[in-house]
Amino acid sequence: MAKETFAPIQKLSPDDMAVKPNLHLSDSYDGFSWESMYEELDWLPGGGLNKAHEAIDRHANGKNRDKVAMIWEGKNGEREDYTFGDMKRLTNQFANVCQSLGIEKGDRVFIFMDRLPELYVACFGALKAGAVVGPLFSAFGPEPVRDRMKDSGAKVLVTQPDLRRKISGIIPELFDLQHILIANKDGRDPQPIDAQDLSYEEEMDKASNDFTTVETGQYDYSIMHYTS
């Protein structure tokens, strides 16, 4: 077998690059301070730190309320725009859903969905409720979902109809799991949900859009992401 040859590594000055970097590492490193980062954060009224507040509420509470925060484009060409105000309202509703299901600070809420708007609403809403969010790749089979859910002790799973059916065989093994929320976007899946499951849409419709974010701190867990 012929031996592969590779061109030698070339060390270039940023000024000699065809596409110049936005920042110089040495300059950025020398000028960085955590204190300056803290100054850019809004913080919770009680001095805590919460990702959902920093990503959504701080903007929704000010001049950016009607500015588009998220654009979703579906596989079939659909498009939905969500302002910061929309995201605050929806995530407040989901935070209330979490509390109605008994979720307390530090409890695990896992999300097994395609990249639908409901995924982001559930993620940030659960963070507002003080939960630790576990994202699950939608291409996972039953075993990776089971392993992560069992290890984490997740109490709530948010998923969609086809993915719920894919993992139906492992649900009895998840002894800590208390609730499954099924998000059936626009009613696209005609099959009824299982009797023990809850409709994401129905729970959201019942939930208030007024919520005070749970006081979380910068050293509290917020995301539980498994890698292989």
Which ranges hold each PLM region?
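Structural core segment of the AMP-binding/adenylate-forming
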Residues: A2-P14, F124, K128-E202
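Conserved AMP-binding/adenylate-forming core of the ANL superfamily
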Residues: D66-F124, G141-R146, S199-E202
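Conserved S/T- and glycine-rich ATP-binding loop of Class I adenylate-forming
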Residues: M87, V109, A126, L157, ...
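Helix N-cap/beta->alpha junction signal
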Residues: M113-R115, Q160-P161, D220
